[in-house]
């Protein structure tokens, strides 16, 4: 059952709302504009606030839905987390878009929202504070994501291993941003 859900979650995660919305609304393909990342932050840059919000909601939803379905089917928190990670992997490496995906932060937030909502509040607060101080979305994401791990270790220990893997994936997808941050070239708002 978990494998079937994980496959379905991956396929759902492979839907790139940024790319689909850019096609539906006739705006620039985010993979070819701005930072080149098909996510909400780049959609804000290339297509405006409305499409950025829709992208964010779609990306969060595709992380949340598989976790809720797994819970509804009676799976444990670790299985829920692995199913959610499958959706994030779909976002990172989407089948439908030549495996060119986003950074996974919004989809991971949706997954985390399903697993343990207070962790999303902590991550959102850390993201907002870091962004306010730095005006850099990637830095805010890199600070916020690992901050959820101690809270999960305490409240949802079954999700700790999958969330540690997820944190590593998100850091990996931000490796170019890390290089740019250290070189002083990272984009700011």
Curated annotation (Swiss-Prot):
Its main location: membrane. It is found in: Cell inner membrane. Keywords: Cell inner membrane, Cell membrane, Lipid biosynthesis, Lipid metabolism, Membrane, Phospholipid biosynthesis, Phospholipid metabolism, Transferase, Transmembrane, Transmembrane helix. GO terms for biological process: phospholipid biosynthetic process. The keyword Oxidoreductase does not apply. It catalyses: an acyl phosphate + sn-glycerol 3-phosphate = a 1-acyl-sn-glycero-3-phosphate + phosphate. The keyword Membrane applies. It is an enzyme of class 2 (transferase). Its EC number is 2.3.1.275. The chain crosses the membrane at residues 1-21, 50-70, 72-92, 111-131, 151-171. InterPro entries: G3P_acylTferase_PlsY (IPR003811). It is a multi-pass membrane protein. It comes from the Bacteria. Pathway: Lipid metabolism; phospholipid metabolism. GO terms for molecular function: acyl-phosphate glycerol-3-phosphate acyltransferase activity. One of its GO terms (cellular component) is plasma membrane. Catalyzes the transfer of an acyl group from acyl-phosphate (acyl-PO(4)) to glycerol-3-phosphate (G3P) to form lysophosphatidic acid (LPA). This enzyme utilizes acyl-phosphate as fatty acyl donor, but not acyl-CoA or acyl-ACP. Belongs to the PlsY family. HAMAP family: PlsY. Probably interacts with PlsX. This is Glycerol-3-phosphate acyltransferase. It comes from Pseudomonas paraeruginosa (strain DSM 24068 / PA7). The gene is plsY.
């Amino acid at each position: 059952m978990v494998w079937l859900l994980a496959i379905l979650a991956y396929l759902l995660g492979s839907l790139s709302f940024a790319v689909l919305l850019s096609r539906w609304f006739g705006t620039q393909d985010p993979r070819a504009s701005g930072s080149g990342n098909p996510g909400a932050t780049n959609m804000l840059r290339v297509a405006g606030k409305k499409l950025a919000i829709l992208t964010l909601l779609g990306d969060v939803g595709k992380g949340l839905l598989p976790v809720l379905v797994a819970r509804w089917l009676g799976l444990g928190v670790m299985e829920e987390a692995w199913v959610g990670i499958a959706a994030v992997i779909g976002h990172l490496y989407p089948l439908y878009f030549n495996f060119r995906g986003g950074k996974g932060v919004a989809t991971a937030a949706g997954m985390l929202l399903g697993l343990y909502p207070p962790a999303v509040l902590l991550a959102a607060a850390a993201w907002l504070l870091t962004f306010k101080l730095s005006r850099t979305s990637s830095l805010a994401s890199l600070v916020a994501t690992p901050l959820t791990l101690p809270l999960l270790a305490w409240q949802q220990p079954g999700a700790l291993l999958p969330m540690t893997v997820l944190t590593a994936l998100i850091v990996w997808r931000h490796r170019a941003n890390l290089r740019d941050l250290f070189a002083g070239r990272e984009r700011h708002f």
